[in-house]
Amino acid sequence: TNFGVLASPNATLEELHLLQKLARRLGIENLDCRLRQQDFSLDAAGILAPKLNHSLPEVESLSDVLLVGSYLRKELPMLNHRLRKAQLNSKHISVINPVEFDFNYRLTHSLIDNDLVQNLMGVVKAASELTGKNDQAWLKKSIKVSPEQAAVAKDLMAAKNGAIMLGQIAQVDTHYS
């Protein structure tokens, strides 16, 4: 018989890691925590799980971070702690979220709107205008760039080493991929 493990998407990364170690020790290879995910179209391209392309110490050295659809304080407390340390060292942290959360560090920019995709597209369009590479047809559509979106794009473009991180709220969005 085949067994599987379904883990809560509310579990922390640390809890999920320990659960998969236990499951594999018991010979269970079928694990999934994407219970709320609605868009699986990236699976065909081999993108099965989001990943952090930085070590935790490297996160502290990022000069600018944009969090999209995330409340790291609850999602990934250890990563949140590293970002807090970075912000205390004058690094910029901005967010695009559907609601305002109680972050334990000062945010440089806070774009609060239910439509994460529209807000992110505004930042992308502003960045493309800054680079002069505005040749994408979808960017020429009626995407209006707000001053706050332009400021986020300007900070990210000026950053020596910046990052955009997608959180759990973004991952359960119907337009995730």
Give the residues covered by each predicted segment.
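Catalytic alpha/large subunits of respiratory electron-transfer oxidoreductases
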Residues: 1-177
